């Protein structure tokens, strides 16, 4: 069986090289084009779906909607969950990645962005960026909403949701598309491929390019494939990798 993952298109804050996390930032014009292109590619390659999953954040929701529009599938059922939200970047949210690297060092920023079990500095309870103050989460228990997360923390919410909800749909024969975020999808990739914490450190997921997983009947990993020109995909991955490095003017 197949599972298709789609990282949202470039957001306004991706474009400005800012830490985004749970901040509800919309797609840039480039991101909208990437999302539409993903839908065109999926349609051309003959992919179809029975149910889609996404987060509570508009950049992922809009990416999914734009892709489905190109596929003539806007009527498909869509399940939204904060469990698929981006990793929460704590106090780093809104900061420029290059400027943060210049201040704290590239290695520290790489650890914050790509390490397995080290969280960035947490938000204070009274911070206006605390999810408890956001309308999307008004039905959620405040104590389960994060103030900052490591990738390990992100995995702790993504993987149970995948196993308890998404995988059940797949095992029932449903074709699934997940439109989410760089780190929530990396969390899932680590689980699906049984990667070590060291290996996941160097995984970079490009925006707006469908990633297809082939799984066996028990949901175990067989193979994966990006749907796109190999050189284009490589360039997009390198662009993501370059974020968080000091920019020399």
From Swiss-Prot:
What EC number(s) has UniProt assigned to this enzyme? 5.4.2.11
Which reaction(s) does the protein catalyse, per the Swiss-Prot or TrEMBL entry? (2R)-2-phosphoglycerate = (2R)-3-phosphoglycerate
Sequence positions that bind substrate: 7-14, 20-21, 59, 86-89, 97, 113-114, 182-183
Q: Where is the active site?
A: 8 (tele-phosphohistidine intermediate), 86 (proton donor/acceptor)
Q: What is this protein called?
A: 2,3-bisphosphoglycerate-dependent phosphoglycerate mutase
Which is an annotated Pfam family here? His_Phos_1
* One Gene Ontology biological process: glycolytic process
Which pathway does it take part in? Carbohydrate degradation; glycolysis; pyruvate from D-glyceraldehyde 3-phosphate: step 3/5
InterPro entries (alphabetical): His_Pase_superF_clade-1, His_PPase_superfam, PG/BPGM_mutase_AS, Phosphogly_mut1
At the top of the EC hierarchy, this enzyme's class is: isomerase
Instruction: Locate the site labelled Transition state stabilizer.
Output: 181
Identify its protein family.
Belongs to the phosphoglycerate mutase family. BPG-dependent PGAM subfamily.
Keywords in alphabetical order, please: Gluconeogenesis, Glycolysis, Isomerase
Enumerate the GO terms in the molecular function aspect.
Answer: phosphoglycerate mutase activity
Protein task = Catalyzes the interconversion of 2-phosphoglycerate and 3-phosphoglycerate.
Looking at the record's lineage, which domain of life comes first?
Bacteria
| UniProt organism field | Lachnoclostridium phytofermentans (strain ATCC 700394 / DSM 18823 / ISDg) (Clostridium phytofermentans)
Read off the HAMAP family from this record: PGAM_GpmA
Q: Which Gene3D superfamilies match?
A: Phosphoglycerate mutase-like
């Amino acid at each position: 069986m197949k599972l298709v993952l789609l990282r949202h298109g470039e957001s306004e804050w991706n474009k400005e090289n800012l830490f985004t996390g749970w901040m509800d930032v919309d797609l840039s014009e480039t991101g909208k084009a990437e999302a539409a292109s993903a839908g065109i590619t999926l349609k051309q390659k003959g992919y179809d779906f029975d149910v889609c999953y996404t987060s509570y954040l508009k950049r992922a929701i809009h990416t999914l909607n734009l892709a489905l529009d190109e596929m003539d599938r806007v009527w498909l059922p869509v399940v939204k969950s904060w469990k698929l939200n981006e990793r929460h970047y704590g106090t780093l949210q809104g900061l420029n990645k290059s400027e943060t690297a210049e201040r704290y060092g590239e290695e520290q920023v790489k650890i914050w962005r790509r390490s397995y079990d080290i969280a960035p500095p947490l938000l204070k309870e009274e911070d206006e960026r605390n999810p408890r103050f956001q309308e999307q989460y008004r039905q959620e228990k405040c104590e389960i909403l994060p103030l900052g997360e490591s990738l390990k923390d992100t995995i702790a919410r993504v993987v149970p949701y995948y196993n308890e909800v998404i995988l059940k749909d797949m095992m029932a024969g449903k074709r699934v598309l997940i439109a989410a975020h760089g780190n929530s999808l990396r969390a899932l990739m680590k689980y699906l491929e049984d990667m070590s914490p060291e290996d996941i450190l160097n995984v970079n997921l490009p925006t707006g390019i469908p990633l297809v997983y082939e799984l066996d009947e028990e949901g175990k990993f067989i193979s994966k494939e990006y749907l796109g020109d190999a050189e284009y995909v490589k360039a997009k991955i390198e662009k993501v990798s370059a974020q968080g490095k000091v920019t020399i003017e």
